[in-house]
Amino acid sequence: MKKLRLLLLISLIISCLFAFASCDDTEELSAPQNVEIEQATLTLNWKAVAGARLYTISIAKDGEEPREAIASKTYYSLTGLSEGHYTIKVKANGKEGVSRDSKWSQTVLFDREKETGMTFTLINGNTEYEVSSKGVASGDIVIPDMYRGLPVTSIGKKAFFNKSDVTSVTIGANVKSIGDYAFANCSYITSINLPKGLTTIGESAFASCRLMAGEIVIPEGVTTIPKNAFAYCGSLEAVVFGSNVTRIETSAFTDCAKLTALTLPDKLEYIGNLAFARCKKLTSLDLGTGVKEINDYAFSELVALESVAIPNSVERIGEGAFYLCELLGNVTLGNGIKEIANGAFYDTKLWNANTSSNEIYVGKWFLGCKDNTQPVLNLREDTIGIASYALYGNTGLSTLILPDSVQIIGEAAFGKMSIIVAIIGSGVTEIGSEAFGSCKQLSTLILGSFDDKNENIKYSSLKTIGDYAFRGCEVLDKVEMPSSLKVVGTYAFRDTGIYKNSENVVYADNWVVDYVEGIGANVAIKEGTVGIANYAFYNCTVLSSITLPNSVKTVGRAAFYDCSSLSQVELPATLEVIEDYTFYRCKSLNLFSLPPMLTYIGRSAFYKCGTSANATVGDTDNDVLFIPSDVKYIGDFAFYNCGYSERASIEEEQYYNIFGIDSIVIGGSVEYIGSNAFNGFISLKSVDLGGTQYIAEKAFYKCESLATVDFGTSLKSIGEKAFYKCESLKEVILPETLTDIGSYAFYKCESVANVELGGATAIGSFAFYGNTSLKMLDIPMSVTSIGKQAFRNCKSLTSIIVSPAIEVVEQHAFYGCSSLTIYVAYDKAPDTWHKYWNSSYRPVVYNCELSEDFSYVLYVEKGTISHLNSNSSLSDPVRAGYVFIGWGTSSTASVPAFTSANLSEAESGRKLYAIWAEE
């Protein structure tokens, strides 16, 4: 019996032990989350698991058994893996008696490429890769078309900078951009290709690739060859330019010593300083047909070049442009030249040729004399231009007589000469800056020539006298100006005898050219005066009023710049042009009428006028600024911040109203309103744009009181931020002529309740962002693109039609439009629309037909009425001038069968029509 009891007890104990063993109450750990691979460092990372002691990593290479590794941290380096495809997972290890191991995490896939020495970084919203070097790149570099399923589109700044062990580079077909210094100082690269899709080459991208030989082909998408792009590529033998290159910048091909021939594209307009300097084997140079400017030393030291044809398009040949082209003796000069700068052809065969003539010419331009001390000058009768510094410092001539054929006198052409008499001829139209500067003995100046009997003067057709043109001609006390003259430059007659008897104002014949110390506060310009020179009253802080007679036709650039006390100006009715900066920062200037014959208002012409404590509020009966009907151009910053007071104590409602302008009426001829032209007119309430065609960026920026704008019938383009934060603007009715609405054009115009887009084809990014009062909007069939966040936070907008013409809808276009239903003509969003075009998940009704009168036709099919947010309700469509009644089953229905609320109940395949009633 005792044995039986003992056996039962032992059996019970064993059973309990088994029971306890089978009832392990330790907790299983959670599986690791957020298992990811950091590509830049090839590190496996995951989120820490509470209670984990260690982590086990399972690494399985395709075709091989998995192996396991242990990690005590929440990361593990994968750099030791060989090339191949891997499946990787992680689990958390529990503590004995406390917790159990977790299940495996979700697997991640990993491709270990062959080591290339390159790093790939995601760009452009993680849709593309940019490549750079990790520091070990060497040998033959191959930049792939694709990486991890995405295109490689960019080579980063200094990506392979100074990699002397790189010998060749093959660039993938998808690369569009090569960054600054990307391959600079890769001195052993022997070859490189530029893919056809390339559009951008960075500064110094290939500079000092000294062994890069053969031919470089510039792709068609490239428009600019930037500074130093191929400088010091001493082995480069040929360059083939794409037809769309328009600019070659400074030193782009400097010291490409093996280039033998160049053919530049016809679209090329600009050649920068030193662009092809010291290309010492260049024997053939074709400049194309479009170049306008050859800058300083652009082709200097081309010691093998013998001839060149300058095309008719070239207007300026810069200083030293062909300096030290020792064999250059044959130059054909086009007929468009307006300036040949100092030493443009110095030390060429042209200059050093052994001829009997002392005068040196290129084409019909006089360059200078071999001997600058000769007392005789024999200019050819067909001479049309005098190059800059042509006779500068000549000590032999006492009388200078130019033939009537001469049209242009260059910069400092006759500076510091000992001439006493100068007769410039009747053909001259332009005298360059400092042309006769410091000719201290010059006493007689004839701006024309004598007739055959030497009795009467034939005045020249002179239009421009340049800055400082006669400065320092100490004994010159008289000059007769021709009636053709339009511009007299800054201080053109400063330090001449003309100043000796001047009181207050300095006159050169019938032009005001300067003022003298001691000028009075009130000045009346004498009758018969025809022009005011550039900078004539610059910084004349004592001047408070000036009266200009009706004979004045020209007021020069910056004529009254910084006349801070000037408050009263009477402009003549005959004035046609107000030049750039004319009344710049005349802080005390009060409102006045613009002359009726005005055609041009220059850049910053009235910049910050009327901003000082001395300015007075304009007459309330004269609160309209009329832009005369003949004005075609209003320059950038023309009226910028006029009336923005600096007085901290002024009442808030007057703070921006020193000019007293409530309205602007623009005449019918204006073609262009410049950027920031009326920026800061915060008291402005209404604008009539008349015949304006183009409104540039920020033209009416932050005109916070602007309530009404008549956009006219001619407007074609509205620039970026043109009406930015015009918070009082009520509606935007654009004409059919309009095509472009710039980014931020009507940003945060919070009072705009109605918008008609006219003939717009593109709606820029952020164009109507934050228009919280906007309720209705019909997008016309002309619109093809809607920019990023174009209608973001238009919280009152209830419906919008996206027509079949719209090819592109950018990211977050309708973000924050909390009341919006979107009607779309397609059966789904096209692939050309951004992935997050409807990032607010507003309800979308697909398969809508849109008629020309903005009626709706819906195809109700299964799945086409999409409530992407369960809290959203379908809003009624909106049509200007009508009230929506409901949805009918035929185009003639007058009684609705459905409302927007129960539209989803319509049977599949039914076609419904919007029913409208006139308001």
Residue locations for each model-derived region?
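Conserved aromatic anchor
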Residues: 42-51, 887
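Short, flexible loop/turn segments at beta-strand junctions in immunoglobulin-like
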Residues: 48, 77-82, 904-905
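Short beta-strand segments within Ig-like beta-sandwich modules, predominantly Fibronectin type-III
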Residues: 67-73
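Beta-strand-rich modules
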Residues: 78-98
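Extracellular fibronectin type III
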Residues: 95-112
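Structural signature of tandem-repeat unit edges
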Residues: 124-126, 136-153, 164-177, 187-200, ...
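Consensus positions within tandem repeat domains that build extended binding/scaffold surfaces
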Residues: 157-159, 179-182, 202-205, 226-229, ...
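Secondary-structure capping and domain/repeat boundary segments
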Residues: 263, 357, 446-448, 665, ...
